[in-house]
Swiss-Prot record:
Its cofactor is FMN; [4Fe-4S] cluster. This is NADH-quinone oxidoreductase subunit F. FMN binds at residues 174-221. It comes from the Bacteria. The gene is nuoF. Composed of 13 different subunits. Subunits NuoCD, E, F, and G constitute the peripheral sector of the complex. [4Fe-4S] cluster binds at C351, C354, C357, C398. Pfam families: Complex1_51K (PF01512), NADH_4Fe-4S (PF10589). Binds 1 FMN. SUPFAM superfamilies: Nqo1 FMN-binding domain-like, Nqo1 middle domain-like, Nqo1C-terminal domain-like. InterPro entries: NADH-UbQ_OxRdtase_51kDa_CS, NADH-UbQ_OxRdtase_suF, Nuo51_FMN-bd, Nuo51_FMN-bd_sf, Nuop51_4Fe4S-bd, Nuop51_4Fe4S-bd_sf. It is an enzyme of class 7 (translocase). It catalyses: a quinone + NADH + 5 H(+)(in) = a quinol + NAD(+) + 4 H(+)(out).
Length: 445
């Protein structure tokens, strides 16, 4: 496993991390060039110049979609009369297998505060909210202390750095709903409404929180902004090994020797992360499959491990980069059981607004449970494939259902024999269940 040496030039997000994993508070953060990007932005650049720099740097959203951050910012209204604007940080990190934002908020809370300060100035937003996953109790404590420190130091509040710019920042904890990761459901929840997605248009940039222009960005996205302003566009583009600029928090979980996450340049291959950083599979286990970016991404196989971790390459392979925290599956894990577990989560977390999602996901779970018990019926696999089509992109209000069926459709594609083994056979009472030969099963016919 590689010995990681973090420097400001190669690890703009994580170089300030302490070895004892304690949070970096204001004095230490400022001693390590903290708020230098904010100083340059607020005292030397106009809001439009900041938006242009972020756009030119090629910063893409780190929440999974990979949309241009600068372009998203430029969609905010130019009308100066619309002077009530909001900046929302989507910190509702509930994707199974993903924990990157938690690291940043717990150990580098001032990095997020600085990123939001610069972003708010660029967007002309006077108030910001960090919508935080309710279970992230330690992150909430650390963020609130960081906000208090920044306010006392004149880095938040009124007339910041003597520029006349005012910005207040608040932490709002969620109530444990996965769907709040969708930006309009997050806005509804923040307003005290039912957490279901809104119809688009209007988009949040024109009508968001309380009907006002609103920009929603992910934690890691906002944490990239200070380094771009402090070090420049060219530097940010050059630290990547890909046409996707910058670095990304990437990692592997599952039964690997050293599960974790690391800040790596875009273009690093999945095999490098698995073998050089995560240490490979545990002794006695064979690699079987992986999900590149969390539970809601398509499975890929060992043949795809040499792909660079970047949005386009993973997309062309039939999956999504997502959060870039991959989950490794070993040969002892049955795909039917694994997918059933994932679909149970997604079915439970559906907001119930759309009929296909509300009824289709529980239906898939019912079929998967039958296949897992060896009691599947002929045609069940075809029904699952049909459900994947019915729940695909454009069939529901938001991307919850399309993301939910990605692991299902890809598991059937690559491991169909494991699903076929769960179909009840009238002339045999032995089955290959989930890739493992069990004892004789009792006849059920």
């Amino acid at each position: 496993m590689k010995n990681v040496i973090r420097t400001p030039e190669t690890h703009p997000l994580t170089w300030r991390l302490r070895d004892d994993k304690q949070p970096v508070w204001l004095d230490e953060y400022r001693s390590k060039n903290g708020y230098e990007g904010a100083r340059k932005a607020l005292t030397g650049l106009s809001p439009d110049e900041i938006v242009s720099q972020v756009k030119d740097a090629g910063l893409k959203g780190r929440g999974g979609a990979g949309f241009s951050t600068g372009l998203k910012w430029s969609l905010m209204p130019k009308d100066e009369s619309m002077n009530i604007r909001y900046l929302l940080c989507n910190a509702d990190e509930m994707e199974p297998g993903t924990y990157k934002d938690r690291l940043l908020m717990e150990q580098l809370p001032h990095l997020l505060v600085e990123g939001m300060l610069i972003s708010a100035f660029a967007l002309k937003a006077y108030r910001g909210y960090i919508f935080l996953r309710g279970e992230y109790i330690e992150a909430a404590v650390h963020l609130r202390r960081a906000i208090a420190e920044a306010t006392e130091a004149g880095l938040l509040g009124k007339n910041i750095m003597g520029t006349g710019f005012d910005f207040e920042l608040f932490v709002h904890t969620g109530a444990g709903r996965y769907i709040c990761g969708e930006e309009t459901a997050l806005i509804n929840s923040l307003e005290g409404r039912r957490a279901n997605p809104r119809s688009k248009p209007p988009f949040p940039a024109t009508s968001g929180v309380w009907g006002k222009p609103t920009c929603v960005n992910n934690v890691e996205t906002l944490c990239n902004v200070p380094a771009i302003l402090a070090n420049g566009v060219e530097w940010y583009q050059n630290i990547s090994k890909s046409k996707d600029a910058g670095t990304k928090l990437m990692g592997f979980s599952g039964r690997v020797k050293n599960p974790g996450l690391w800040e790596l340049p875009f273009g690093t291959t999945a095999r490098e992360i698995l073998e050089d950083y995560a240490g490979g599979m545990r002794d006695g286990l064979k690699f079987k499959a992986w999900q590149p970016g969390g539970a809601g991404t398509d499975f890929l196989t060992e043949a795809h491990l040499d792909l660079p971790m970047e949005f386009e390459s993973i997309g062309k392979a039939g999956s999504r980069l997502g959060t870039a925290l991959a989950m490794a599956v070993d040969h002892e894990i049955g795909m039917v059981s694994l997918v059933r577990n994932l679909e149970e989560f997604f079915a439970r977390e559906s907001c119930g607004w759309c009929t296909p999602c509300r009824d289709g996901l529980p239906w898939s779970v019912k079929i998967l449970r039958a296949l897992e018990r060896g009691e599947g019926q002929p045609g069940d696999i075809e029904t699952l494939e049909q459900l994947c089509r019915f729940l695909g992109p454009g069939k529901t209000f938001c991307a919850h259902a399309p993301g939910a069926v990605e692991p299902l459709q890809s598991a059937i594609k690559y491991f169909r024999e494991e699903f076929e083994a769960g179909i009840k056979q009238p002339f045999s009472n032995t089955h290959l269940i989930n890739g493992i030969q069990p004892n004789l099963l009792k006849e059920r016919w």
